[in-house]
C-alpha cells in the first residue's frame, strides 16, 4: 500500500536481492509452502520444519499443476502448520518424517492419507517431487489431489511412489528437469526492464491550436 506504480520495479529488485520471489496466489500451481517454526524455535519441534519447507518451495515454485497445490510442514504431531489438510503434507516426528497426501481445506474438508514414513529430508523431498509429478501426469485438469487420490486409490499411489524406488526416482527426475524451464520470476524480469514502458510516466499532453 502506498507504493507508486512506477516505483514497483525498484521494489521488486530490492525484494529479489533479499531472496524473495513472486509467489503464485491464483495460478494452477504451487502456493507458498506453510510451516511452523520447528525445532529451532519451538520446544515441541522434532525437526527443522522451516528449513524443509524452504527447500520444498525452492525446488517446486513456478511449477504448473492441474489445479492449485498446497504443501505444509509441521515440526511435530501438534500440526500447527495444518499439514493434514494439504495436497502434500509433512509431519515431523522424532524418528523422521510422515508424508501425507490428498488433503483439502475449505468447504469440503478432507483429511490426508498417510503415504509413508521416511527417515531423512532428502527422502521426503524425493517422495514429494515424485508425488507431484505423478499428479501432474495423471490427474485431470482442474482435479485437486483429494478427488484424484479418492479416484485412483491410495494403494495405487503407494505402489508407484513408495514401493517402486526406480519409478519414484524417475518421476522425481522428470519433475526436477521440467523445473529448469518453469522457474521464471516475473518480479525479476520486470526489475531488469521487461515491460519497462508500462511503468513509465506518461508525457504531459501538448495542445496545439486548431488549423
Identify what each model region corresponds to.
Residues 70, 75, 79, 84-144, ...:
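Mobile "lid/hinge" segments at catalytic clefts and subdomain interfaces of large enzymes
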Residues 1-98, 192-211:
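Small-residue-enriched alpha-helical segments and adjacent helix-cap loops
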Residues 32-33, 72-78, 145-157, 176-181:
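A glycine-rich phosphate-binding loop feature that marks nucleotide/adenosyl-phosphate handling sites
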Residues 3-7, 41-48, 116-123, 137, ...:
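Catalytic cores of large soluble enzymes that bind and process phosphate-bearing ligands
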Residues 7-11, 32, 48-56, 120-128, ...:
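General structural feature for long, well-ordered alpha-helical segments within catalytic domains
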Residues 162-197:
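Acidic, Ser/Thr-rich low-complexity intrinsically disordered segments
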Residues 16, 20, 61, 65, ...:
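Generic secondary-structure signature for well-ordered alpha-helical cores
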